[in-house]
Amino acid sequence: MDALLREKSVKRQILKRSFVLAAALVCISSWSFAWEYPVIKGYGAVDPVPSAAFRPDKSIKYRVLFDITKGAETVDKVNPGLDRVARFLNVMAVSNIMPKDVELAAVIHGPATPVVLKNAIFKDKFKIDNPNEKIVKALKEAGVSLYVCGQTLVEDGFKNKWVNERIAIAVSASIVIPTYQLRGYAYLPIF
């Protein structure tokens, strides 16, 4: 009887130690994870997902138009649409497709429009620096064409001279979108 009790006790201890070891391994593996930013540093975090069965096709010339209409949750945050454009570039880069090998454009309108303001104007209106300044600069340096809807500027009471010089003013987002689609760009709405 004593031998049977000792055997059960040993099995319980082994089971407990196995559980503790498994929990420790899970914690260690989660601590070692780090997002990557191969092209747009600090924005558009990606994981390479080496086991992914579906990856970008290197034989395709990717031409994508992002339609950015959603504003950030708060004015001190980077616009999620701009971050998605950065993520697209970073995902392509971890798949060995560099910015020079893709053609990207983004049109900004609706609630997202304040991101286009020059820092001084943004600061005057919202009492903080424009958190989108750096990502706009990085996207332009990576070759992304950025547009803002002129109709939205007028509706929001924003003057053309208030727009960041890296962002072109379009007569309307409703002209940018079909023009790029007719030029063969894939349309990717960001709501």
Predicted regions and their residues:
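Histidine-anchored nucleotide/phosphate-binding helix
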Residues: 78-97
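N-terminal secretory signal peptides that target proteins for export/translocation
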Residues: 1-15
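Acidic helix-start/capping segments at beta-turn-to-alpha-helix junctions
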Residues: 98-116
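Bacterial N-terminal signal peptides
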Residues: 18-29
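Sec/Tat signal peptide C-region and signal peptidase I cleavage site
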Residues: 30-34
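Solvent-exposed, acidic/flexible segments
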Residues: 71-81, 99, 129, 170
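Acidic/histidine-rich, surface-exposed loop or edge segments in extracytoplasmic proteins
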Residues: 57-75, 116-120
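A cross-taxonomic marker for long C-terminal extensions/tails that follow the last structured domain
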Residues: 36-46, 122-123, 128-191
